[in-house]
């Protein structure tokens, strides 16, 4: 609240209207301004009342500020600090200066060394900085790989899967978990990318002993949808359990794209069939058609009548913690119970997969 007083010398304040309070306030202001050690007292009130009616200080009207004794304390400080902050630097100094990358890096290193001087244990700080730097590099690499995958097209007659994995220098350096056979050769691989939590089926080459590889089989679940709309042949997307040998009858082979679900991915090894296995395939395929509640489906074996097995040792194969037993078809569950002695070990090694 601003107090406005007349500068007329003949206008004296009236005591009944609060002149004592005004004089006391002016005494407090004078003590704060001139550094008076003694606090204001009631005896000094009439003297300060006479002094407050004096003429304004010389030169104060040029700055737009009246006598600080007759002006309220808040208004005076507002004007004072506005005048002090009124100074603006020239526009030339406000222009953006371009700094090279080397100068910026040198400045960062210099500031880091200055900070290390005041740290009690620099080794802990350096270790933490290295961890943060590695994490940032890994995140950057994952972002790059999510936008543009660095895996080249790997044909069946090209480089083997093992040589391809060892030769590539990808920014994503996490060790892939693959299924190994006794002969230490990689037939197919399922790679888990943590960006988005998708399973990727990489186009790795199969064993050189196998002449031609066909697409793997899958049993569609109740809620399966069409996995791909392109004209390319479908990718292998069946499901399997850990360390279980499946017969060919437990899997059905399809050609159309709409019959392959995209919610399950697994790894298979390929071997040729004998004459007895071919007969067994035809018999059990007819039984599967009658048990399937979706009606008769047009499907036929593909390629050179190859069977697919889950054979070999699986090392910590994608333990995601999901349990997708409900998504498996009833006929598929029955065939698994026949082949497995212990039902609790019927755990899907791959689940929640999708193609990118």
Swiss-Prot record:
Matches recorded under PROSITE patterns: SERTA (PS51053)
Segment Disordered: which positions?
33-53, 215-238, 280-302, 332-356
Bias kind Low complexity: ranges: 215-232
On the tree of life, the source organism's domain of life is Eukaryota
Show the GO cellular component annotation of the record.
nucleus
Write down the PANTHER family for this protein, in alphabetical order: SERTA DOMAIN-CONTAINING PROTEIN 4 (PTHR14272:SF4)
Instruction: Output this protein's name.
Output: SERTA domain-containing protein 4
Which species does the entry assign this protein to? Homo sapiens
